[in-house]
């Protein structure tokens, strides 16, 4: 196994660990400072993740995935406006934050007067409903087959084929 494959593997795990660290910080702020256990954070995390993925993936070929309707394809739509800085990634993050924030505000308005156990039960139901929607609705997120071909941020910044020359 090449050293660059190992480094790529470690970096991938570090990114996943960073994402879950941010998730746990959000849960800690809510549960730690207010004492209210809110499992709905996982659902809003999923909404943000799927929104950013849906904005950046390209639409699949209809012959294979006829039910899947979305695919923003931001990297190709921005084209030269991208300016070499992966502007699509920033737009996808902003879109994900806005979408998750709007959904969290709507659910928050419905659950604002609930206390402790009832809030935990309600937000568990919300998070599970969101998970099941993304898992089962083929038109939204390709159902149980999941999303694929999600572009990497700064994915082609380094040409690894040139590393073998040195």
Where in the sequence are the language-model features?
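Transmembrane alpha-helices and adjacent helix-loop boundaries
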Residues: 1-166
């Amino acid at each position: 196994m090449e050293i660059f494959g190992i480094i790529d593997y470690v970096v991938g795990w570090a990114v996943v660990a960073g994402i879950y660290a941010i998730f746990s910080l959000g849960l800690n702020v809510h549960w730690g400072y207010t004492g209210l256990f809110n499992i709905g954070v996982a659902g809003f995390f999923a909404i943000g993740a799927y929104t950013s993925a849906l904005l950046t993936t390209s639409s699949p070929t209809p012959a294979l995935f006829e039910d899947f309707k979305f695919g923003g394809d931001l990297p190709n739509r921005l084209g030269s406006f991208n300016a070499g800085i992966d502007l699509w990634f920033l737009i996808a993050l902003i879109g994900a934050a806005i979408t998750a924030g709007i959904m969290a505000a709507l659910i928050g308005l419905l659950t604002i007067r609930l206390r402790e156990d009832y809030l935990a039960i309600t937000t568990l139901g919300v998070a599970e409903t969101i998970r099941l929607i993304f898992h089962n609705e083929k038109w939204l997120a390709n159902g149980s087959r999941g999303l694929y071909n999600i572009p990497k941020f700064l994915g082609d910044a380094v040409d690894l084929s040139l590393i073998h020359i040195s």
